[in-house]
Amino acid sequence: MRVIVDGDAAMYKNDICQLTLNYQIEMFVYLDYAHLLKDAPYPVIECEIGKDSVDMRILSDLKKGDLLITQDYGLAALALGKGAYVLHISGLKITSQNIDELLLRRYIGAHQRKS
């Protein structure tokens, strides 16, 4: 198992890093070139700047059994389909049992914001 961190979970990278070090688990952080970190104590996977470019790279590299940490429910749904485990940055475990409700809430929220 590896821990894959979507760059959007940026505020918790150091905490996640400490946990992965304690449990001797590999951790990779995916960021686009506009958000690169200098001297990070973990591997940073650099992605092109663009809509969903980081998400597409994560999906390309993600393996069954990996743990993805993200706040993107769309990415979470696709990761579940690849057999990965998914945690929201709030700590919520995202599963096949709750992803539909989370995606529906996202859709309704976006629709309300447009109104």
Residues of each region from the PLM?
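Nuclease catalytic cores that cleave nucleic-acid phosphodiester bonds
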Residues: 2-115
